[in-house]
Amino acid sequence: MERQYILNAIDAALCAGKDIISIYDDPASDFEIEKKADNSPLTIADRKAHETIAKILQDTPFPLLSEEGKHLPFVERHKWETLWIVDPLDGTKEFIKRNGEFTVNIALVHNSVPVMGVIYLPVKRELYFADEEIGAYKLSGITTRAEATLDELMASAVRLPDKVGHDKFVIVASRSHLSPETEVYIEEMKRYHSDVELISSGSSIKICLVAEGKADVYPRFAPTMEWDTAAGHAIARAAGMEVYQAGKEEPLRYNKEDLLNPWFIVEPRHVKTKKRSL
């Protein structure tokens, strides 16, 4: 893929992050919370971030599949060899709680595989970006690209994974969706590891923690959609990790007829499959 596309995605994520923070930091804002058809929350920040991302990415040759955009039927989408998959504000519940654990997720998917990913944490001003050719990186303290080239961004960033190997076996799990099946998995891991630590986090940050090497595994045995995982999946792949369907050797696939993900586990590629069992 052309390098310009990842710069497009970075610009879109940073600009959307600026929109989100302008609302998040406004003490008078009540976030104008609505309920979507699946009863999940929707705020004005979700809508504004979507509009910003769509405007920037419209200059690329690829169609856009966004959580907050119009979802075309599969009879149309299946023709898309390459597409953007976007969650303008991943972790709306965390945004509403004002705990800072929300992200902007932008992925480029080619033939059902996420080949490029950008995740931005507006509160922490942390940017994760990756593609198959350059690898995965984390850049801290960024709010705008300011005409920096991709090489300049990479030179200022940390190559992932940054932290490999620690005394404890670290599991990262959802702060808002810790299912009974996940709790069973955690107990099972205690049979294989003498010292297990559980980290709770929101949004796609969990995948990033595995990509960084700060966590060993992220089990997700609860519903997610393709836009929740595509960007993180691209970053994980570029960092030597994989997002496997739970209980299988197969990674998640994208632009499916049903946009709901199966349960999955994020872990290094070399890990034995027994850890993917439920």
Which role fits each region the language model picked out?
Residues 80-119:
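Glycine-rich active-site/cofactor-binding loop and its immediate structural neighborhood
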Residues 47, 69, 176-177, 204, ...:
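Short, surface-exposed acidic/glycine-rich loop or hinge patches that mediate macromolecular interfaces
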